[in-house]
Structure formats: C-alpha cells, structure tokens
C-alpha cells in the first residue's frame, strides 16, 4: 500500500501542509542528514508520520516503517502541585521539559509559536499564512513536557475533501477564499491542551425551598399563588473529575475550537516524536497554571449542580461552600487539528477540522460583489414578474 503523503497547498510540505502541486526543492530550509530525526533506512530521506497507515513513511521511496513506540501505552497523568512548584520556582530545566533538540518557529507577523524536529519544509505560518523566514527559527525554550498525543485519524485527502465541501457550501464567499489552495495555508497542526483530574469534597450550607400553593382573594379576584417554605440545610458532597480539557493556545477563535469537542482524550498515546514527525506542533501559550482557572471554573460549576441536587426541593439557595481539592493531576496533550488560514482583505480567516472526528468549524468572509449581484438579479426578476402581471391584466 502506498504511503499517505500529506499534500501541500502552496508548498511541498512533508510537515503537514496539503499539496496540490509537485514538491519543490526546499534545501535552504532543510537540516543536515545528522539533524534529521527519522531518516529512511532505504534511501536516507526523512520519514513522516503517515496518518492513513499510522506508521512512519518515506515520501521519497515509499518505504514504510513501524513505529518503535508501544502503542498500548497510554498517556500518564502528572502531579499538578509538583508542576506548579516547578513553574513558580523556575525549575523546569532538568525536570520533565521539552527537549532542547526541538526547534521553534516564531512568526514575525502573528507571534505564533510552533515546534518541529529535524527538517522544516513548511513555507507559510499555519496561523496567519505569512511566509516563514529563516530568522523565525530558534532553539525551543524549556517547557513542560508533552505527556501524550492523540494521533491524526483524518488524512490529508479526507481533510481536503471535507474542507472543499465546507467552503463550497458557503454562499457568497469570495473567490479568493474558495481558491484557498493557491492563497492560503492548510496544515496539519498538533495543538496544545491541558487536561485536569481531581477528586473533590465540598462542605456547604444553605437553604432548601419547598413550594406550595394557596388560594387568596375571593369572587372575581380569587387566584392561586405559589409560596415557598425555606429550611436550613448543610451537607457534604463528593465529585470525581477526569480529563477536563482546556485549550492552551492563543490566536485561535476559542469559541469555534471549543465546538470541535469532544476529544477522545482517553485514547491518547504516550508521547513520542514519531507521532508528530512531518507535522507542526503548536506549543502552549498558557501553561498548566494559567489554564487551571478555566478548569476549576468548569469543575466548580459541576460541584454546584451536585450541591443543588443534594439539597433537593423545588428551590436551592447556597450560602457557602468550601472545596477540598484532592488527587489533582494533569496531562499535557497534543490534539490534532487541520487548520486552514486564508488572508482576505488583510484579515485572516481560519477554518478548523477535528483531526479525529472530522468536525468542521470556521469563519468565512463575505463577497460584497456577489451579494450585490444576487440582489440585482432578484430585483430584476421581481420587476419582470410585475411587468408580466400587468401585461396580463391589460
């Protein structure tokens, strides 16, 4: 079976961009043979993670290599308090941090950070479609290590079909948007997420309200009113949370990215660079401490619901609650997104595809010319119909 080679839009990418034309020589951006992470045993060219085969494949000679990692090994949870102490005390170096062998691209236009290993073959920033310059490449700083990855399941051909269908269904989209393969950047990108686990015990005080009805008034003014008896309550409730996900990147439409959920985080494999070979990885912009607030907000909302269920009755009024957080762990995961970025009238428009489920979310520009043309056509049709009706009456 021929390997699935990620096809590029504007450039020949073995790094995740989707090709529409024959690859060009990008030797200026390539590392030496010694810096290549996974050279092919057959020809020496660089291997990439083939999404369709779920193996390492060579786009040059077609050779396929099994992954060296244990595919049955799941991502391991890490102690949250230990990570917070390391971040606060600046002790990431020498701890569980991303290897210094990684290189990092920092886009000069949008500030987006991406990491890669071995050779870089992407020509455009996946987030704003700005051409990548050699000065954009730096050594990656120390960051919390990646614990797991959910590999791409939607390959380049399928992703292209999905995005074409989505774009073609957008009426009044400008031609520049529909010809994204010439004007945009379409890339396979692993985005950064933190997942949080915790066991909680919440002690609360409050009031329980039981409704009852009474009849008041007389005659024509007789009516039924609902009243409430309130009783003081207190109690203890427990909750267990698993994989509360928080998106750790900036520069995306977070509301649209949230609609790509749910993610099958339970299928996350223990991280190995083999899974991301040939694809870009977005490093986190917000660390595990900065993302924790969003996670605890989600958990507290569920705890409040648990308290209200425990109080019972028709109405609940919570006066106080004290939460004891236990067994707090996290995972730093890479989750797969096909990212289309098209610049239209100097504004970037992004479309996202969940690389596992194929769910599509995105923003599209509107063509004023097409809208005006459609309005004119409708107006002409209305005028013609009016003229025909008048001619029939006469």
Q: In which residue ranges do the predicted regions lie?
A:
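Charged, low-complexity helical/coil segments in non-catalytic cytosolic or luminal regions
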Residues: 99, 142-343
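Short Cys/His-rich "knuckle" micro-motifs
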Residues: 50-53, 68-71, 117-120, 135-139
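Cys/His-rich microdomains that often coordinate metals
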Residues: 47, 65, 114, 132
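Residues immediately within or flanking Cys/His clusters that coordinate Zn2+
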Residues: 35-37, 55, 100-104, 122
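Low-complexity, intrinsically disordered extramembrane tails and loops of integral membrane proteins
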Residues: 1-36, 64-98, 137-140, 267-276, ...
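Juxtamembrane boundary at the C-terminal end of a transmembrane helix
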Residues: 384-394
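Extended, hydrophilic extramembrane loops/domains of integral membrane proteins
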Residues: 335-361
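Short cysteine-rich clusters marking metal-coordination/redox-active sites
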Residues: 40-43, 58-61, 107-110, 125-128
């Amino acid at each position: 079976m021929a390997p699935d080679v990620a096809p590029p839009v504007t450039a020949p990418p073995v790094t995740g961009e989707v090709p529409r034309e024959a690859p060009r020589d990008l030797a200026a951006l390539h590392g030496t043979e010694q810096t290549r992470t996974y050279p092919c045993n057959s020809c020496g060219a660089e291997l990439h993670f083939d999404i369709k085969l779920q193996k390492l494949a060579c786009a040059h000679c077609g050779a396929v290599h099994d992954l060296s990692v244990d595919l049955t090994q799941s991502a391991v949870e890490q102690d949250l308090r230990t990570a917070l102490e390391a971040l606060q005390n600046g002790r990431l170096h020498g701890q569980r941090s991303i290897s210094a062998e990684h290189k990092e691209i920092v886009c000069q236009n949008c500030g987006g950070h991406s990491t890669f290993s071995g050779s870089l073959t992407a020509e455009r920033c996946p987030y704003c479609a700005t051409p990548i310059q050699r000065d954009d490449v730096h050594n990656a700083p120390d960051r919390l290590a990646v614990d797991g990855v959910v590999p791409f399941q939607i390959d380049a051909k399928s992703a292209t079909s999905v995005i074409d269908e989505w774009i073609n269904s957008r009426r009044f989209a400008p031609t520049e948007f529909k010809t994204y393969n010439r004007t945009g950047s379409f890339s396979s990108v692993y985005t950064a997420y933190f997942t949080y686990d915790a066991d909680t015990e919440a002690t609360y005080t409050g009031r329980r309200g039981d409704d009852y009805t009474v009849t008041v008034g007389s005659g024509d003014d007789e009516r039924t009113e609902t009243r409430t008896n309130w009783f003081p309550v207190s109690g203890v409730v427990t909750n267990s949370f698993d994989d509360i996900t928080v998106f750790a990147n900036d520069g995306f439409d977070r509301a649209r990215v949230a609609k790509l959920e749910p993610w099958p985080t339970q299928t996350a494999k223990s991280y190995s660079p083999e899974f991301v070979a040939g694809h870009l990885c977005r490093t986190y912009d917000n660390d595990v401490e900065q993302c924790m607030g969003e996670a605890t907000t989600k958990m507290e909302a569920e705890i409040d619901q648990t308290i209200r269920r425990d109080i019972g009755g028709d109405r609940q009024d919570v006066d106080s609650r004290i939460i004891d957080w236990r067994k707090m762990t996290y995972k730093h995961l890479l989750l797969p997104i096909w990212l289309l970025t098209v610049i239209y009238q100097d504004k970037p428009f992004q479309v996202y595809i969940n690389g596992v489920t194929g769910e599509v979310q995105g923003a599209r520009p509107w063509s004023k010319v097409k809208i005006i043309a459609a309005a004119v056509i409708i107006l002409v049709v209305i005028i013609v119909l009016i003229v025909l009706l008048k001619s029939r009456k006469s």
